[in-house]
């Protein structure tokens, strides 16, 4: 039976390079001299530290430019709130999405069930496997998912005939 997987995968090497390039630019830019501005990547969390909300926004802009140049969709970023930390500093933790969350996977599954297509969706550890009798049905399901889930940079892999 033909099938495909709907996944949400980030190229972490490109993200790491973008964070390192952002850190270098922060170190050389005149408006960041003598400030607490910094950026750090740990696992799938990017931590931005600055003296003010404006500085955090500036670092975010630099990071987004670097990610876009590297070919990473910025919809992979789940931007957190800006928090005050000691000594007139602020920080923001941005999570890099990797894998479809259960809630989003259920939305995809309900979308497919509600469409009355002759395909089935099964949630499997951070991805949704869609199976159907015909290749055309699967391609229609892909189009439906792409059209409805615009806020997620979903990709489709493991297409089997």
Swiss-Prot record:
Tell me if Nucleotide-binding is a UniProt keyword of this record. yes
> InterPro entries given for it?
DUF520, UPF0234_N, YajQ-like_sf
Question: Which molecular-function annotations from GO does this UniProt entry contain?
Answer: nucleotide binding
- According to the record, the segments passing through the membrane are none
Checking Pfam families in the record gives: DUF520
The Gene Ontology CC terms held by the record are: cytosol
Can you tell me which residues the record assigns to a coiled coil?
A: none
Q: Which UniProt keywords apply?
A: Nucleotide-binding
Q: Which family does it belong to?
A: Belongs to the YajQ family.
Q: Which PANTHER family match?
A: UPF0234 PROTEIN YAJQ
Q: What does this protein do?
A: Nucleotide-binding protein.
Its name, as the record gives it, is Nucleotide-binding protein Bpro_1596
């Amino acid at each position: 039976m033909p099938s495909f997987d709907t996944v949400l995968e980030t190229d972490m090497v490109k993200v790491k390079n973008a964070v390192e390039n952002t850190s270098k630019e922060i170190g050389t830019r005149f408006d960041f001299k003598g400030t607490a501005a910094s950026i750090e990547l740990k696992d799938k969390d990017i931590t931005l530290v600055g003296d003010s909300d404006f500085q955090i926004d500036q670092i975010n802009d630099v990071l987004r430019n670097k990610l876009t140049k590297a070919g990473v969709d910025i919809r992979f970023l789940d931007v957190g709130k800006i928090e005050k930390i000691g000594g007139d500093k602020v920080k923001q933790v941005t999570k890099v999405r990797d894998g479809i969350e259960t809630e989003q996977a259920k939305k995809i599954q309900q979308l497919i069930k509600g469409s009355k297509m002759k395909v089935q969706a099964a949630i499997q550890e951070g991805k949704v496997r869609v199976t159907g009798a015909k290749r055309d049905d699967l391609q229609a399901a892909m189009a439906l998912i792409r059209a409805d889930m615009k806020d997620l940079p979903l990709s489709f892999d493991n297409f089997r005939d």
